[in-house]
Protein backbone atom coordinates (compact mmCIF):
# COMPACT_ATOMS: atom_id res chain seq x y z
CA UNK A 1 0.00 0.00 0.00
CA UNK A 2 0.89 3.68 -0.11
CA UNK A 3 2.53 5.24 2.93
CA UNK A 4 0.82 8.50 3.89
CA UNK A 5 3.91 10.58 3.09
CA UNK A 6 4.40 8.96 -0.31
CA UNK A 7 2.89 10.65 -3.33
CA UNK A 8 0.55 8.35 -5.22
CA UNK A 9 2.01 7.62 -8.65
CA UNK A 10 -0.40 8.61 -11.43
CA UNK A 11 -0.18 6.72 -14.71
CA UNK A 12 -2.00 7.67 -17.93
CA UNK A 13 -2.52 4.76 -20.32
CA UNK A 14 -3.74 4.84 -23.93
CA UNK A 15 -3.70 1.83 -26.31
CA UNK A 16 -4.59 2.19 -30.01
CA UNK A 17 -7.81 0.25 -29.37
CA UNK A 18 -9.48 -1.75 -26.63
CA UNK A 19 -11.28 -3.77 -29.33
CA UNK A 20 -8.50 -6.34 -29.09
CA UNK A 21 -8.00 -8.82 -26.25
CA UNK A 22 -4.24 -8.37 -26.53
CA UNK A 23 -4.50 -4.84 -25.08
CA UNK A 24 -7.17 -5.84 -22.56
CA UNK A 25 -4.86 -8.59 -21.28
CA UNK A 26 -1.78 -6.35 -21.23
CA UNK A 27 -3.78 -3.73 -19.34
CA UNK A 28 -5.21 -6.22 -16.83
CA UNK A 29 -1.68 -7.33 -15.93
CA UNK A 30 -0.49 -3.71 -15.68
CA UNK A 31 -3.49 -2.87 -13.46
CA UNK A 32 -2.83 -5.85 -11.21
CA UNK A 33 0.84 -4.96 -10.74
CA UNK A 34 0.40 -1.19 -10.36
CA UNK A 35 -2.45 -1.70 -7.87
CA UNK A 36 -0.02 -3.71 -5.78
CA UNK A 37 2.33 -0.72 -6.00
CA UNK A 38 -0.52 1.60 -4.92
CA UNK A 39 -0.51 3.60 -8.17
CA UNK A 40 -3.49 5.22 -9.85
CA UNK A 41 -4.22 4.30 -13.47
CA UNK A 42 -6.18 6.40 -15.98
CA UNK A 43 -6.98 4.18 -18.97
CA UNK A 44 -8.32 5.68 -22.21
CA UNK A 45 -9.38 4.13 -25.54
CA UNK A 46 -8.76 6.27 -28.66
CA UNK A 47 -10.55 3.72 -30.90
CA UNK A 48 -7.86 3.92 -33.61
CA UNK A 49 -8.31 7.71 -33.87
CA UNK A 50 -5.02 9.65 -33.72
CA UNK A 51 -6.74 12.96 -32.90
CA UNK A 52 -8.48 11.33 -29.96
CA UNK A 53 -5.24 9.80 -28.70
CA UNK A 54 -3.49 13.14 -28.89
CA UNK A 55 -6.30 14.70 -26.77
CA UNK A 56 -5.96 11.88 -24.26
CA UNK A 57 -2.25 12.66 -23.86
CA UNK A 58 -3.10 16.36 -23.37
CA UNK A 59 -5.59 15.30 -20.67
CA UNK A 60 -2.86 13.26 -18.94
CA UNK A 61 -0.58 16.32 -19.00
CA UNK A 62 -3.33 18.45 -17.38
CA UNK A 63 -3.87 15.71 -14.77
CA UNK A 64 -0.12 15.93 -14.02
CA UNK A 65 0.46 12.19 -14.37
CA UNK A 66 3.95 10.88 -13.57
CA UNK A 67 4.09 8.37 -16.41
CA UNK A 68 2.34 7.94 -19.76
CA UNK A 69 2.07 4.44 -21.20
CA UNK A 70 1.20 4.64 -24.89
CA UNK A 71 0.58 2.22 -27.70
CA UNK A 72 0.42 4.70 -30.61
CA UNK A 73 -2.52 4.70 -33.04
CA UNK A 74 -0.03 5.87 -35.66
CA UNK A 75 3.72 5.83 -35.08
CA UNK A 76 4.51 8.98 -37.05
CA UNK A 77 1.37 11.01 -36.29
CA UNK A 78 2.27 14.73 -35.96
CA UNK A 79 -0.52 15.35 -33.44
CA UNK A 80 0.45 12.42 -31.19
CA UNK A 81 4.13 13.38 -31.39
CA UNK A 82 3.39 17.01 -30.56
CA UNK A 83 1.30 15.99 -27.52
CA UNK A 84 4.05 13.64 -26.34
CA UNK A 85 6.60 16.46 -26.70
CA UNK A 86 4.41 18.61 -24.40
CA UNK A 87 4.31 15.73 -21.93
CA UNK A 88 8.12 15.45 -22.00
CA UNK A 89 8.45 19.22 -21.39
CA UNK A 90 6.18 18.77 -18.36
CA UNK A 91 8.67 16.19 -17.02
CA UNK A 92 6.43 13.18 -17.60
CA UNK A 93 8.10 9.82 -18.29
CA UNK A 94 6.94 8.08 -21.48
CA UNK A 95 6.79 4.32 -21.96
CA UNK A 96 5.86 3.08 -25.44
CA UNK A 97 4.41 -0.43 -25.68
CA UNK A 98 3.82 -2.95 -28.47
CA UNK A 99 4.55 -0.57 -31.39
CA UNK A 100 7.38 1.98 -31.44
CA UNK A 101 6.84 5.69 -31.99
CA UNK A 102 8.84 7.69 -34.54
CA UNK A 103 12.23 9.06 -33.47
CA UNK A 104 10.92 12.66 -33.38
CA UNK A 105 10.07 12.36 -29.72
CA UNK A 106 12.51 11.23 -27.06
CA UNK A 107 10.69 8.54 -25.11
CA UNK A 108 12.10 6.95 -21.97
CA UNK A 109 11.69 3.33 -22.97
CA UNK A 110 10.04 1.15 -25.62
CA UNK A 111 8.74 -2.33 -24.78
CA UNK A 112 7.87 -4.40 -27.85
CA UNK A 113 7.70 -7.96 -29.09
CA UNK A 114 10.36 -9.02 -31.55
CA UNK A 115 7.93 -8.28 -34.39
CA UNK A 116 10.38 -8.67 -37.26
CA UNK A 117 11.26 -12.15 -35.99
CA UNK A 118 7.54 -13.05 -35.92
CA UNK A 119 7.40 -12.54 -39.70
CA UNK A 120 10.59 -14.53 -40.20
CA UNK A 121 9.22 -17.50 -38.21
CA UNK A 122 6.01 -17.60 -40.27
CA UNK A 123 7.88 -17.45 -43.59
CA UNK A 124 10.20 -20.27 -42.46
CA UNK A 125 7.28 -22.44 -41.38
CA UNK A 126 5.43 -21.83 -44.66
CA UNK A 127 8.53 -22.68 -46.75
CA UNK A 128 8.99 -25.87 -44.76
CA UNK A 129 5.39 -26.94 -45.45
CA UNK A 130 4.82 -25.71 -49.01
CA UNK A 131 7.10 -26.02 -52.06
CA UNK A 132 5.57 -22.83 -53.52
CA UNK A 133 2.98 -20.23 -52.57
CA UNK A 134 0.85 -17.35 -53.83
CA UNK A 135 0.48 -15.13 -50.81
CA UNK A 136 -2.13 -12.58 -49.71
CA UNK A 137 -0.75 -10.15 -47.10
CA UNK A 138 -3.16 -8.56 -44.60
CA UNK A 139 -1.69 -5.36 -43.20
CA UNK A 140 -2.15 -2.49 -40.76
CA UNK A 141 0.02 0.19 -42.32
CA UNK A 142 -0.14 2.73 -39.49
CA UNK A 143 1.23 0.25 -36.96
CA UNK A 144 5.02 -0.15 -37.11
CA UNK A 145 4.75 -3.42 -35.16
CA UNK A 146 2.47 -4.87 -37.85
CA UNK A 147 4.66 -3.64 -40.70
CA UNK A 148 7.77 -5.09 -39.02
CA UNK A 149 6.08 -8.51 -39.03
CA UNK A 150 5.21 -8.17 -42.72
CA UNK A 151 8.78 -7.00 -43.47
CA UNK A 152 10.32 -9.99 -41.67
CA UNK A 153 8.13 -12.25 -43.78
CA UNK A 154 8.92 -10.47 -47.07
CA UNK A 155 12.68 -10.41 -46.43
CA UNK A 156 12.71 -14.15 -45.66
CA UNK A 157 11.02 -15.21 -48.92
CA UNK A 158 12.68 -12.54 -51.06
CA UNK A 159 15.29 -14.76 -52.71
CA UNK A 160 12.86 -17.63 -53.30
CA UNK A 161 11.07 -17.14 -56.64
CA UNK A 162 8.54 -19.91 -55.92
CA UNK A 163 6.96 -17.81 -53.13
CA UNK A 164 5.09 -14.79 -54.53
CA UNK A 165 3.11 -12.02 -52.89
CA UNK A 166 0.12 -11.46 -55.14
CA UNK A 167 -1.79 -8.83 -53.16
CA UNK A 168 -1.64 -6.66 -50.02
CA UNK A 169 -4.79 -5.46 -48.25
CA UNK A 170 -5.28 -2.90 -45.46
CA UNK A 171 -7.29 -4.42 -42.58
CA UNK A 172 -6.45 -2.20 -39.56
CA UNK A 173 -5.85 -5.50 -37.77
CA UNK A 174 -9.60 -5.83 -37.12
CA UNK A 175 -11.71 -8.92 -37.90
CA UNK A 176 -14.66 -6.91 -39.21
CA UNK A 177 -12.45 -4.88 -41.59
CA UNK A 178 -10.69 -8.02 -42.85
CA UNK A 179 -13.73 -10.05 -43.91
CA UNK A 180 -14.84 -7.78 -46.81
CA UNK A 181 -11.20 -7.35 -47.94
CA UNK A 182 -10.65 -11.11 -48.24
CA UNK A 183 -14.10 -11.66 -49.74
CA UNK A 184 -13.19 -9.00 -52.33
CA UNK A 185 -9.91 -10.75 -53.11
CA UNK A 186 -11.75 -14.05 -53.65
CA UNK A 187 -14.49 -12.38 -55.73
CA UNK A 188 -11.81 -10.82 -57.96
CA UNK A 189 -10.55 -14.35 -58.57
CA UNK A 190 -7.17 -13.70 -56.93
CA UNK A 191 -5.43 -17.05 -56.78
CA UNK A 192 -3.74 -17.39 -53.38
CA UNK A 193 -3.03 -20.41 -51.19
CA UNK A 194 -1.45 -18.61 -48.21
CA UNK A 195 -2.72 -15.74 -46.06
CA UNK A 196 -0.13 -13.97 -43.91
CA UNK A 197 -2.10 -11.80 -41.47
CA UNK A 198 -0.44 -9.16 -39.31
CA UNK A 199 -2.41 -10.44 -36.28
CA UNK A 200 -4.84 -13.14 -35.16
CA UNK A 201 -7.84 -10.81 -35.45
CA UNK A 202 -7.15 -10.41 -39.19
CA UNK A 203 -6.44 -14.16 -39.53
CA UNK A 204 -9.87 -14.93 -38.03
CA UNK A 205 -11.53 -12.45 -40.43
CA UNK A 206 -9.75 -14.16 -43.34
CA UNK A 207 -10.86 -17.60 -42.13
CA UNK A 208 -14.50 -16.44 -41.88
CA UNK A 209 -14.45 -14.96 -45.40
CA UNK A 210 -12.83 -18.09 -46.88
CA UNK A 211 -15.26 -20.42 -45.08
CA UNK A 212 -18.23 -18.37 -46.35
CA UNK A 213 -17.07 -18.96 -49.95
CA UNK A 214 -17.05 -22.73 -49.38
CA UNK A 215 -13.81 -23.19 -51.35
CA UNK A 216 -12.61 -26.69 -52.03
CA UNK A 217 -8.90 -25.80 -52.10
CA UNK A 218 -6.73 -25.52 -49.00
CA UNK A 219 -5.63 -22.03 -48.00
CA UNK A 220 -2.99 -21.85 -45.27
CA UNK A 221 -3.69 -19.02 -42.81
CA UNK A 222 -1.10 -17.54 -40.45
CA UNK A 223 -1.63 -14.93 -37.74
CA UNK A 224 0.46 -13.27 -35.05
CA UNK A 225 -0.47 -12.94 -31.34
CA UNK A 226 -1.10 -16.40 -29.94
CA UNK A 227 -4.59 -15.35 -28.86
CA UNK A 228 -6.83 -17.93 -27.13
CA UNK A 229 -9.20 -17.92 -30.17
CA UNK A 230 -6.47 -18.93 -32.59
CA UNK A 231 -4.89 -21.45 -30.21
CA UNK A 232 -8.30 -23.05 -29.93
CA UNK A 233 -8.54 -23.34 -33.75
CA UNK A 234 -5.04 -24.84 -33.82
CA UNK A 235 -5.92 -27.38 -31.13
CA UNK A 236 -9.26 -28.47 -32.59
CA UNK A 237 -9.25 -27.87 -36.38
CA UNK A 238 -6.92 -27.71 -39.36
CA UNK A 239 -8.30 -24.29 -40.39
CA UNK A 240 -5.29 -22.30 -39.18
CA UNK A 241 -1.68 -23.14 -40.05
CA UNK A 242 0.05 -21.24 -37.28
CA UNK A 243 0.51 -18.09 -35.24
CA UNK A 244 3.40 -16.44 -33.48
CA UNK A 245 2.79 -16.05 -29.77
CA UNK A 246 3.36 -12.71 -28.15
CA UNK A 247 2.99 -12.29 -24.43
CA UNK A 248 0.80 -9.36 -23.36
CA UNK A 249 1.10 -10.62 -19.78
CA UNK A 250 4.90 -10.44 -19.86
CA UNK A 251 4.62 -7.04 -21.55
CA UNK A 252 2.28 -5.65 -18.88
CA UNK A 253 4.58 -7.00 -16.18
CA UNK A 254 7.62 -5.36 -17.79
CA UNK A 255 5.83 -1.99 -18.00
CA UNK A 256 5.00 -2.16 -14.27
CA UNK A 257 8.59 -3.15 -13.47
CA UNK A 258 10.01 -0.20 -15.42
CA UNK A 259 7.56 2.22 -13.74
CA UNK A 260 8.85 0.96 -10.39
CA UNK A 261 12.48 1.47 -11.46
CA UNK A 262 11.60 5.00 -12.60
CA UNK A 263 10.00 5.82 -9.26
CA UNK A 264 13.04 4.51 -7.39
CA UNK A 265 15.39 6.53 -9.61
CA UNK A 266 17.11 3.33 -10.77
CA UNK A 267 18.38 2.73 -14.28
CA UNK A 268 16.41 0.88 -16.97
CA UNK A 269 16.99 0.09 -20.65
CA UNK A 270 15.81 2.29 -23.51
CA UNK A 271 14.38 -0.79 -25.22
CA UNK A 272 13.08 -4.19 -24.16
CA UNK A 273 12.43 -6.87 -26.80
CA UNK A 274 10.02 -9.58 -25.68
CA UNK A 275 10.76 -12.91 -27.42
CA UNK A 276 8.15 -14.51 -29.72
CA UNK A 277 7.46 -18.19 -30.50
CA UNK A 278 5.92 -20.03 -33.43
CA UNK A 279 2.81 -22.00 -32.43
CA UNK A 280 1.43 -24.59 -34.86
CA UNK A 281 -0.41 -27.90 -34.70
CA UNK A 282 2.86 -29.70 -33.88
CA UNK A 283 3.42 -27.85 -30.61
CA UNK A 284 -0.01 -26.46 -29.64
CA UNK A 285 -0.29 -29.10 -26.89
CA UNK A 286 2.45 -27.23 -24.99
CA UNK A 287 0.27 -24.09 -24.75
CA UNK A 288 -2.79 -23.25 -22.71
CA UNK A 289 -5.67 -22.54 -25.10
CA UNK A 290 -7.86 -20.79 -22.54
CA UNK A 291 -5.73 -17.71 -21.95
CA UNK A 292 -2.74 -15.67 -23.09
CA UNK A 293 0.87 -16.42 -22.36
Set out the residue ranges of the language-model regions:
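Extracytoplasmic "Venus flytrap"
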Residues: 10-29, 33, 42-55, 59, ...
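Hydrophobic alpha-helical segments within soluble ligand-binding/sensing domains
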Residues: 11, 53, 110-134, 147-148, ...
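Periplasmic-binding protein-like
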Residues: 12-13, 65-74, 93-97, 136-137, ...
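Short, solvent-exposed amphipathic alpha-helices that sit
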Residues: 22-37, 118-122, 145-163, 177, ...
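Short beta-strand elements at the ligand-binding edges of bilobed clamshell
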Residues: 43-45, 102-125, 137-140, 236-249
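Hydrophobic alpha-helical
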Residues: 73-87, 153, 172-231
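Flexible loop/hinge segments that line or gate small-molecule binding clefts
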Residues: 77, 81-117, 134, 227-236, ...
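Hinge/cleft segment of the Venus flytrap/periplasmic-binding protein
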Residues: 156-157, 247-293
Amino acid sequence: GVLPDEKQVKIGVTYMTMNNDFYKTLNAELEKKTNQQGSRLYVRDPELDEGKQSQQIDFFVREKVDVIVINPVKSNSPSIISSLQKAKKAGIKIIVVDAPISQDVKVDTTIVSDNYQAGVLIAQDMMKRLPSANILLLEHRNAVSAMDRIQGFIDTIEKQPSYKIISQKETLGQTEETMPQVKGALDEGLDFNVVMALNDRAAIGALAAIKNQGLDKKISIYGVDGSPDIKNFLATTSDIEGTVAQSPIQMGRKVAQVIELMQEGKSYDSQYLIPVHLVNRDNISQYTVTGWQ
